[in-house]
Design a protein with these regions (language model features):
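GST-like fold's C-terminal all-alpha helical module
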Residues: 101-201
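GST-like domain detector, emphasizing the conserved glutathione-binding G-site
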Residues: 1-133, 226
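Short beta-strand edge/turn micro-motifs at domain boundaries
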Residues: 20, 204-205
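Conserved beta-strand edge residues that scaffold enzyme active sites
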Residues: 33-36, 171, 213-214
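Terminal-tail/helix-coil boundary detector
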Residues: 208-227
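Extended hydrophobic/aromatic segments used for targeting, binding, or gating
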Residues: 200, 206-209
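Residue-level recognition of oxygen-bearing side chains
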Residues: 69, 191, 204
Length: 227
C-alpha cells in the first residue's frame, strides 16, 4: 500500500501526520500553505478537503478524507491505537471522547473563528455590526460553552492518564488540536496542561511537528485573535 497525504499547514490535518508517525507507516507528504497558489498541492478531494489521503493499492487509487474516517479506517488495519485491549469503561470512554471531539467540541471552537472572519471581511465602515454580534454571541453563549467543555475535560483528565484510560488511543490524537487551540485562554486547567505536556513528549508527536512544518506561534496567534 502506498499512502499520499495532502496536508494543510497548521491545520487539523496535523493530527493525521502524527497518527501515521505513531503507526510507523511510510507515506508521501504533500503540504499546502495558506499563501500557496500552486494547484499541484491542492487536495484531490472534490471539496478540496484537508486532510485527504490517496491510497494506492494493487494499481488502484482511492481517496479518503475526513480526519475521523481516516483514523477509523487505518485503526481497522492497524488496531493498536484503537479499541484493542480496552476494558468496558475504557471502551465507553474511547467512543465517547472520539465522537465528542468532532461532533460537539470542535463545532463550538470553529464558531469563534467564523464570527471573527466575518467581522474581518466586512467593510470597515460597518464592521462594528458583526463585531457587536460576535461580542453578544461570545458573552451570551460561546464563552460559557467552551468553559464548560474545558472544565469537564479537566475533571476527566484528573482521573485518567489518557482519554480512554491508561492506554493512548486515537481519541487522544483527535482531542489534542481543540485543546491546544483553547489552552492559552484556559490555562487554569492544570490537568489539561499536564496532558498537553505529556503529548509533547511523545517521539512520534515531535517527528510529526517537524514533518508538518508546524508553527506554534502562528497557531497561537490565529486562535488568540478569535477570542
Amino acid at each position: 500500500m502506498q499512502i499520499r497525504l495532502f496536508h494543510l499547514q497548521n491545520s487539523r490535518s496535523q493530527r493525521i501526520i502524527w497518527f501515521l508517525e505513531e503507526l510507523g507507516l511510510n507515506y508521501e507528504l504533500i503540504t499546502k500553505y495558506h499563501s500557496d497558489e500552486d494547484k499541484n498541492n491542492n487536495s484531490p478531494h472534490q471539496l478540496s478537503k484537508f486532510p485527504t489521503l490517496e491510497i494506492i493499492e494493487q494499481e488502484q487509487t482511492s481517496i479518503l478524507a475526513e480526519t475521523s474516517a481516516i483514523l477509523d479506517y487505518f485503526s481497522h488495519l492497524h488496531p493498536q491505537l484503537g479499541q484493542n485491549n480496552l476494558l468496558n469503561q475504557q471502551l465507553q470512554n474511547f467512543y465517547y471522547w472520539k465522537n465528542y471531539c468532532e461532533a460537539t467540541f470542535i463545532p463550538d471552537l470553529v464558531l469563534k473563528q467564523i464570527f471573527h472572519q466575518i467581522a474581518e471581511r466586512t467593510p470597515f465602515l460597518v464592521r462594528f455590526v458583526p463585531k457587536l454580534l460576535k461580542y453578544g454571541f461570545d458573552q451570551g453563549y460561546l464563552n460559557q460553552s467552551l468553559q464548560r467543555h474545558m472544565s469537564m475535560i479537566d475533571k476527566h483528565l484528573e482521573r485518567h492518564l489518557w482519554f480512554a484510560g491508561d492506554q493512548f488511543t486515537t481519541a487522544d490524537i483527535l482531542m489534542w488540536f481543540p485543546l491546544l487551540a483553547c489552552s492559552q485562554n484556559y490555562s487554569q486547567f492544570k490537568h489539561i496542561q499536564r496532558y498537553l505536556v505529556q503529548i509533547e513528549n511523545r517521539p512520534a508527536f515531535k517527528n510529526a511537528l517537524i514533518k508538518g512544518q508546524w508553527s506554534a506561534s502562528t497557531f497561537q496567534t490565529y486562535w488568540a485573535i478569535a477570542w
